[in-house]
Design a protein with these regions (language model features):
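Phosphate-binding glycine-rich loop
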Residues: 66-112, 126-130, 136
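Active-site "gating" loop of Rossmann-like NAD(P)-dependent oxidoreductase/epimerase domains
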Residues: 198
């Protein structure tokens, strides 16, 4: 039996057991006012399942191999960049990014990065893991993003950057934050896991 036939059989078996694709792992009956609203989670269709099966069955690595290289090239082209580095999660991406920026700009342990007080721990953890100090800024209650006025108030001689992470994909006042960063000659760092391409 060929690998393609094995993949076809596996796809058919998964569809029989789980239902037609696309498939959401947290798929449950939704009851308004009672059920939680899942805004993320594993979601895939036949294309992703087929690539996963081929990668496993043909002995290719998922972590860094042919499929990841293809994706990195397409991703770079879409966003007009020379290259991209894919990692296993947004948490790892933030950790790699902060470590690279610290080295590139010569940041010292104890230097400060301004972050929103509302967001994910994956924005704050890499700051701490790299020996930097998070400085928290309050939010506005319209879109749950920065109180822009407070960002400028929190800047000190040790501030090296502002780490943005749009809450639930809600855009923040990018122009105002960029203006502040440019005036104080600090870096604007973006975690776009929830707003990629927006």
């Amino acid at each position: 039996m060929s690998i393609d036939n094995i993949i076809s059989d596996l796809l058919e078996k998964v569809q029989c057991e789980e239902g037609a694709f696309p498939y959401m792992v947290n798929k449950r009956e939704f009851i308004p006012g009672e059920s939680p609203v899942y805004y993320s989670g594993p979601y895939w269709d036949n294309n992703e399942i087929e690539v996963i099966f081929k990668s496993f069955l043909k002995g290719k690595w998922l972590a860094s191999g042919e499929e990841v290289n293809k994706f990195e090239r397409k991703f770079s082209k879409k966003f007009g960049k020379a290259s991209s580095l894919m990692v296993n999660s947004g948490s790892s991406a933030n950790l790699v990014m902060i470590a690279a920026l610290k080295k590139k700009f010569g940041w010292q342990d104890g230097d400060e990065i301004i972050v929103s007080c509302v967001g994910f721990p994956t924005t704050i953890a890499p700051i701490v893991q790299n020996g930097l100090k998070p400085v928290f800024v309050d939010i506005n209650f319209t879109d749950l993003n920065w109180d822009v006025d407070e960002v400028e108030e929190k800047i000190s001689t040790k501030t090296r950057g502002v780490f943005s992470s749009p809450v639930l994909g809600n855009p923040y006042d990018f122009d105002a934050i960029l203006d502040i960063c440019e005036r104080y000659k600090i870096q604007l760092i973006s975690d776009n896991c929830d707003s990629l391409g927006s």
